[in-house]
A protein has these predicted regions:
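Hydrophobic alpha-helical transmembrane segments
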Residues: 1-61, 103-207
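Acidic (Asp/Glu-rich) catalytic motifs at the cytosolic membrane interface
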Residues: 59-106, 131-138, 193-194
Length: 207
């Protein structure tokens, strides 16, 4: 069994929601996990339809919120009912998180002409995931929170980006995206440097 480490800005309110409402969730843990496939498809459909009517981006916002809810409760439901699939859940939950991320970015590909910047966004996001899982393999501590940001905060960024495109159009996002990618690159380098430094110290203590 792995342990999670780190914290996010919204971790406290999330723990309250999980504790308060888990027993009312009507679906099983694996149903909640697999629903990410539905939300991913909705995001792609919304991006495609937004080419003709930008208001379809509100479907993207709804899909992000729904994916947040199902992702927040899938593990909690399994633990509460003692029906969790630990290994399957760990693999599918995190892999489908990446699928959702990729579909979200790909949906903007219908609206933005500069696909290279979007591809770089996916590469940088994958860099954070790779670092997380390599760190987990080395320490057995699973940290999905970096610099106070976790999945919830990232979803808020997704929603903000979607509303920005709906409000001001894709041109403004195209101007912001290079700076956003630069910011992500700086954070990724900082994360890798910090992680390798911590692992180095652990290795030196265990010599």
């Amino acid at each position: 069994m792995h342990t999670k480490s780190g914290r996010s800005f919204l971790g406290g309110p999330e723990k309250y929601l999980v504790k308060r409402f888990t027993k009312y969730v009507p679906l099983e843990t694996y149903h909640l996990t697999l629903l990410t496939l539905v939300w991913s498809a909705l995001v792609l459909v919304a991006g495609y339809l937004a080419q003709k009517n930008i208001d379809w981006l509100w479907l993207t916002v709804a899909a992000i919120v729904l994916q947040y809810i199902t992702d927040l409760f899938d593990g909690a439901v399994g633990r509460y009912r003692k029906t969790g699939l630990v290994k399957w859940g760990f693999y599918m939950d995190h892999y489908l998180d990446y699928v959702f991320l990729a579909c979200f970015v790909a949906s903007f590909g219908f609206l933005l002409p500069n696909i290279h910047m979007l591809a770089l966004t996916v590469i940088l996001a994958a860099g954070f995931m790779i670092s997380t899982f390599l760190d987990f393999g080395a320490t057995q501590e699973f940290s999905i929170y970096h610099f106070g940001f976790g999945p919830t905060e990232i979803r808020i960024v997704f929603i903000a980006a979607t509303i920005l495109v709906w409000w001001k159009g894709a041109v403004l996002l195209a101007q912001v995206l290079p700076w956003f990618n630069l910011f992500m690159a700086v954070l990724l380098v900082s994360l890798v440097y910090r992680t390798q430094k911590q692992l180095w110290k652990q290795d030196m203590r265990n010599r």
